[in-house]
């Protein structure tokens, strides 16, 4: 559309990031990726801005130790005042895989592919680093309040710890 530049200028920023559709729910999405300045969570799939600032932003993202670009985008977004998230879908809209109504007035729209077993298994190894401590705490508290299930809970705790130690990506937490 011919008015994209004018729409972008109305945001009064140097970089505009698309808003995450919170596929896992707002709490889990915020827990894993954080937010951009306390507002919505930025999605790394669609963005626009001025060339100089975009180059600086993308170079900074490439230098981070964390392998997750979306977490990096949100972390960098919090450290810069010239970045905003298109929370009202004026320019960008990301749809959830489960959304039935896929109509949008946004000039740029993203429709996710069909999530399969490989995507879900990859998500478990990638995102375990963000939720492992909560799962571990829940299992320990469960042992205290459910002593009759102690054997199962201890086994689950050992298995979860072994999985985390052997397979989970820890690039964002170490």
Where on the chain are the PLM-derived regions?
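Conserved donor-nucleotide/metal-binding helix-loop-beta segment in metal-dependent transferases, i.e.
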Residues: 1-36
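Generic cytosolic/nucleocytoplasmic N-terminal low-complexity/intrinsically disordered segments
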Residues: 11-13, 104, 118, 149
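Short, flexible coil/linker elements and helix-boundary hinge sites characteristic
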Residues: 12, 33, 81, 146-149, ...
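Catalytic core and acceptor-binding pocket of nucleotide-sugar-dependent glycosyltransferases
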Residues: 39-140
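Transmembrane alpha-helices
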Residues: 125-171
